[in-house]
Amino acid sequence: QASTDEIKIGVILGFTGPIESLTTTMASSAELAMKEVSDSGLLLGGASVSSVRADSTCVDAGAATSAAERLVTSDNVAAIMGADCSGVTTAIANNVAVPNGVTIISPSATSPALTDIDDKGYFFRTAPSDARQGQVLAQVVMDRGISELAVTYTNNDYGKGLSDSFVNAFKAMGGTVTAEVPHEDGKGDYSAEVSTLSASGATEVAVLGYVDQGGRGIIQSSMETGAFSRFILADGMIGDSLIENVDGDLTGTFGTLPGSESEGANMFKAMASSNGIPGDGPFEPESYDAAALIMLAIQAGNSADRSSIANNVMGVANAPGTEIFPGELGKALEILKDGGEVNYQGATNVEFSDVGEASGSYKELEIGNGEFNTIQVR
């Protein structure tokens, strides 16, 4: 049992690897929720919450499993906020979290395959499954009058799951996919992949990869050879580092990212920006919510015991109860202390399915004037 004067929560994200530019503010967003709870003095009668960071690497399942094992055995964390990428999240859930009875809430692992893992009630995610993102992105593409394209995806659980979902949805809407080309992350040269994509005859390409490695490499190589001039992106490609690091004009490039412009999203953005976090960056709201749910579950069960946390996540996430928004965690702790119920809405309108997944909405984004702009929420 975790000590009740200081409760540790693991934050395992890819601080190195193909989405490293996104993870620092994801972690800071989770830690913002922890600070809010610690400062309130209301968790289990005054416990403080501290974050223990660990590196998932995003792509190396062995390294991620070892890092998670250290969190659970040496650091004795009460629960885990993470991981980020789907393959390492699956490995951590199956190899470490579930066998040890540790609740794990991912803010960004979106592979449809995670819906079906035998998680014994310990795995949750505040980002929606890519089964839905594939459909939304296909609709966005169709609505823009694009009926033919090539697809490249990062060759892992995330990329394959999203590509299947997107391609099937696009074809069902009458679209034509001229090529599906997997790519590996961490390569120095992507000209072969770009040449295959281009040779398929498509003038548009969907890049379902990672913003700091393979996906960006595909885009850079496409710009250099003139193969493609704008790109269709999914969530793993959305980030300011793309605009900063690609040599060329990305105006008109568009894509999807889980998110909304709801009351909760705006409240989180205001709170985050006063703490030096953008607040509407990729998976920042989902990270705040994931950490918040862990702490509310601790309070609801009146215990930082690992098994108690898992049993209480659903109860605080869904109706019935008082709706709770970002910045209102103290209020939620007070209600739970008095035996009341909360329905945590948070920054992302949290509502879990019976397997602990967010349904979620998506922002359609487009690059213009050197930044990502929200076109609409779907």
Which residue ranges define each predicted feature?
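Extracytosolic ligand-binding ectodomains
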Residues: 1-378
